[in-house]
Amino acid sequence: MNLAQDPSEADGPTFSRRFVRSVTLVSGAGQVADFVLPLFAGAVLGLTAAQAGALLAVGLATSFLLRPLGGVAADRYERTTIAAASALVLGAGYVLVAATATFPVVLAGVLVSRAGGAFLWVALRATAGARHQVDPRAFARLMSAEELGAWVVLAPAIALLAAAGYAPTFAAAAACTLIAGVLLASSRRRASTRGSGDVDAARADPLVEARGAVVRGLAARLRPLLAVVTVIGTAEAAVGLLLVLHLQRELGLEPLAIAWVSLPGGIALAVAPPHLHRLTVRYGRTPVLVAAAIAGAAFAGGLALARDPMTIAVLWILSALALAAILPIEQAALTEAAGPARIGRALGLYEATTLLAAALGSLAAGILYDAVPWAAACATSAAVILVGGLLLPQVIRQLAPMQAVG
């Protein structure tokens, strides 16, 4: 899968190979940390479930608060420089976790890594947002590079965890981020992605920024889209966690077996975005979004009837295809609505919104799993996904130029 057909220029119509590889490495490292940290908290630190949850919540809160600031930075400063420095900070956080089994140091590592990740991902998405003006495939390509990390980095890391333990696994994640930082820095020397460049966002008037009127207006303009993103993201996160709980507690699968069940969906999520973008170009956003909403709802509803891991794996592919269609369209619509001078701020708000949705979805999943039958929990998630997905085209149509909606 060649995501970067132009091997040299990061600011041309496509991303450079160095940029793509760095995205894959940092994405895979982040997925490793997300998978391993809860296990590490219980097995090595001896934390209770509530304490482990609090540790994760503090990290997520840090990321949530810093992502809008990352958007401000991405609009004012060199985005590749921000991404490279943030990748190094992310790696430093993983090094702290790998180096010791004492809670204060691990907490510091979690906070440092979440801070680095907040600035990193906003800068990377803002780079894609700037590319979107000359290459509408930019967000689909970025998503493919991200999801490639799930089976290029995460799958070997699970094997490393089983063979060598937690510290080497976190060290490997740190190595991935440090290599990514070097790749980003080297691509910065070869091709600038400056916020005030021809392709990237222009800098805003500092006097206007000081008043904050434009930022507040941007938030108000994007509020309907961000609200729908929150609804869909909450339902998707809820059904994802519900499924993991079901596989673990009802079907008795171990973490490695759960990873194998999710692998076909992960591969689909990495491969599908550019192909689904072609369908979006051919048929328009509205038909693709409606089809994706139906596919996502079919995944959630079908889980109520699925009784074996093979069927669940097939259904997981439906969910992956839905996300591969919806997420690049959401990000592209947000970029178009924000305008070139506010790409970073808009995507900072978007990143914070998706993080909030993930937190709400996790909370909802826990409540649904304990309070209602499995079939009712799946049906509830399916209904929310379908309604949110059907609302999304109308919300996007109100934001974007008519020719971009289709």
Could you tell me what each predicted segment is?
Residues L66-E78, L161, A272-R285, Y369:
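Helix-to-loop junctions at the C-terminal end of transmembrane segments
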Residues T169-A185, C378-P393:
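Symmetry-related core transmembrane helices of the 12-TM Major Facilitator Superfamily/SLC fold
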Residues R342-D370:
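A late C-terminal transmembrane helix in Major Facilitator Superfamily
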